[in-house]
């Protein structure tokens, strides 16, 4: 099921499809030379195979993202059924900060489940980076998992130089865009255009959502300068284990070596 394409946007920077498979299903994906694609598992597990390469197949669960850059073919098996979203950025080089004329080829699994958890200094929200220049070798996209406990909010802000979307993976949250309020529930998608003021809050339910920025490099502007989103590492990954790396405390959008 297609859930976002150029018919909904001002351009074709993001294409998103949702898949739900039955047990023992197989799917094949081909990526073009000038595109990047990532596959995020929402439920179940996927066995991956990479025909005509020396890359070994592996089992992927909902703490990992399959990232494809350039010309590649990927085969997916879902032994017990699965749901996942496939996001593609056509001609990703136009979104890179310092792009060259070379289209790289890369295929990797990002184990974001072992990435460091960051906590907001002003409330109990948590953040985990899913895609970044350090993780996937391009700054054309940046992805994050955001966790909102009950009765939590973020300050109003907007972004210059990028558009982004939120996809709700569990729970519910209220989004306020330019003063208009909308409740979002599991598997809802919200798209934020550049310079569109927005903020979020929860009531009696907690919420988890992923958000992806295109381009990944952009500037966040806070409509009020108090309590801006500052994030500090808590020393564990999302499973409570030691993380794979350290990320320094930073204001959202201003971190280095993310």
What do these predicted ranges mean?
Residues 38, 52-71, 179-196:
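Short acidic-glycine-tyrosine-enriched beta hairpin
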Residues 15, 28, 35, 53-54, ...:
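Short, solvent-exposed loop/turn positions at domain surfaces
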Residues 28, 33-64, 75-76:
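Extended, compositionally biased flexible segments
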Residues 1-15, 22-29, 57-62, 81-83, ...:
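A short, N-terminal "cap"/entry segment at the start of jelly-roll beta-barrel domains
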Residues 65, 80-96, 191, 205-223:
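A short hydrophobic beta-strand segment most commonly corresponding to one strand
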Residues 165, 171, 176-187, 197-202, ...:
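Compact recognition or signaling/catalytic modules
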Residues 74-79, 200-203:
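Asparagine-centered strand-capping/turn motif at beta-strand->loop junctions
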Residues 20-21, 31-48, 145-149, 158-175, ...:
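Short, conserved beta-strand element in jelly-roll/cupin
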């Amino acid at each position: 099921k297609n859930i976002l394409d150029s018919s909904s946007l001002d351009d074709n920077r993001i294409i998103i499809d949702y898949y739900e498979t039955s047990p023992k299903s197989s799917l094949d994906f081909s990526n073009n030379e000038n595109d990047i694609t990532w596959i995020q598992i929402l439920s179940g597990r996927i066995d991956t195979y990479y025909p005509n390469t020396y890359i070994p197949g592996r089992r992927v669960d909902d703490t990992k993202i399959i990232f494809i850059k350039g010309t590649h073919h990927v085969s997916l098996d879902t032994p017990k059924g699965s749901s996942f979203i496939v996001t593609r950025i056509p001609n990703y080089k136009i979104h890179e900060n310092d792009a060259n004329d070379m289209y790289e080829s890369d295929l990797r699994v990002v184990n974001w489940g072992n990435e460091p958890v960051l906590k907001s200094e002003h409330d109990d929200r948590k953040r985990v980076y899913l895609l970044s220049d350090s993780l996937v070798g391009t700054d054309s996209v940046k992805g994050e998992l955001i966790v909102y406990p009950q009765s939590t909010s973020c300050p109003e802000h907007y972004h210059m130089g990028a558009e982004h979307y939120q996809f709700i993976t569990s729970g519910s949250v209220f989004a306020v865009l330019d003063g208009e309020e909308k409740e979002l529930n599991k598997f809802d998608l919200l798209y934020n255009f550049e310079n569109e003021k927005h903020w979020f809050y929860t009531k009696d339910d907690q919420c988890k959502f992923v958000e992806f920025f295109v381009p990944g490099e952009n500037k966040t502007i806070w409509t009020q300068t108090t309590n801006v989103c500052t994030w500090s590492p808590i020393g564990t990954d999302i499973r409570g284990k030691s993380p794979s790396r350290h990320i320094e405390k930073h204001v959202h959008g201003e971190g280095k070596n993310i």
